[in-house]
């Protein structure tokens, strides 16, 4: 509908000899008394045209030519808004396109021909996934789904941090536990990894190699074994939430030298030095962010020779540009808030178009039972494990609860609510709407011979639906493509959750107030078509969110 109205406004501007120099925005008023759609184009163009906004709005409306079967009324409101009131029959007849488009309904073309990379999870392979990482994983997976629905070709990537100090600590942790299992007392530092999984890895090494590694000075075997074991576990956990990746970028590649003997990390330092943004003092290599107005420079290479997180992150992002992605989306936890702006600044200095980078920060998660904060782990050394949460509430509840609040908001994950089999549980509420429609359609097919094909053929009957409940539901279903656009623009799947909840709420109300199977044949068919369309929108939305669409509950 927005495209339809936009095109007619463009034609009206052309007829009135008004240059359309600005984008035409069509919005839905928050109060239905002000129409089904509204535009502020007269307010936007008034200054350029040297006219009073209301006078300009009058001139535009005089040149609008709508069919009486589509737009019933156009009015000027306030300082110069133009409000449009659609014919209810026209709205309802559009519902047919939902059924004919099926799984394709809502898919856009804005990203056609463009490649996007979405990086998410990217947890260090030093232990099982935590709940916080899980929220970022679900957020990233949903955003990738949204961009695909928006027409993009999407690469889902995991940045595999297999280099640096944490990996050294991991390998040493396993080595010490291995020695301990060999019957030798060791002093295990508190700074090392404490979880039972470390002992499990050490036990596997002992079983395979015996005690011959006790005197070895090398930790490489311990590192490789731990890395393989932990990352396999991470991927299995993600698989439980139906989270997958197309590629895994290993951090160690950024330390590898090319034919000329220069690593990607060193290339970044050399390029920043040429731009005058590298300094060396206190034995370290510094990114001179004070030249950018910051209070302190940021270390890139520590005095120990170990790079800080910033250096490989900059080098990694350079590879994203070199791989030709049009859109670069990063899903970070709140612990990256202070770091990523420095990465952006470095990329700007190096000449990259950082407008192509979009960052989504997801805030922390706490879990509660009976209103009290709890830990989701019984394993010493690990707090809030994602596997334990999935075990407790299931994959669907885990996914939906992670995104039912804005990514910018701290999430209180209510375990009791997630396990409820009632309308209070948002997962149950949404899935029950889908199951209710499936049940209705089974009865309709068995008792009245209704089928999808017949429903599509009788779509003209939709114009017979005139009650407020029917029209509001139909109108809301047609919003689905706009919701996809909004989610893609702001990288916020929570908007899809809100929308689907409103669809379910409207359907439950329609179901209660408008008899379906006992209605006259034409009305019955039309209401079944409306139910089919609702089921399709719910299914498409569930696919975006990565939750199942049960046929019965």
Curated annotation (Swiss-Prot):
EC number(s) given by UniProt: 6.1.1.19
Record-linked CDD domains: ArgRS_core
Leader sequence residues: none
Chief location bin: cytoplasm
Localization per Swiss-Prot or TrEMBL: Cytoplasm
Name of this protein: Arginine--tRNA ligase
Source species: Chlorobium phaeobacteroides (strain BS1)
InterPro entries named among the record's database cross-references: Arg-tRNA-ligase, Arg-tRNA-synth_N, Arg-tRNA-synth_N_sf, ArgRS_core, DALR_anticod-bd, Rossmann-like_a/b/a_fold, tRNAsynth_Ia_anticodon-bd
Alphabetical GO biological process terms: arginyl-tRNA aminoacylation
Reaction(s) catalysed by this chain's protein: tRNA(Arg) + L-arginine + ATP = L-arginyl-tRNA(Arg) + AMP + diphosphate
Gene name, Swiss-Prot/TrEMBL: argS
Residue pairs linked by disulfide bridges in the UniProt entry: none
Coiled-coil portions: none
GO MF annotations, alphabetized: arginine-tRNA ligase activity; ATP binding
Subunit-structure text: Monomer.
Record lineage: Bacteria, Pseudomonadati, Chlorobiota, Chlorobiia, Chlorobiales
A GO CC annotation given for this chain: cytoplasm
Keywords, alphabetical: Aminoacyl-tRNA synthetase, ATP-binding, Cytoplasm, Ligase, Nucleotide-binding, Protein biosynthesis
NCBIfam families: argS
Family from the record: Belongs to the class-I aminoacyl-tRNA synthetase family.
Motif 'HIGH' region, residue numbers: 123-133
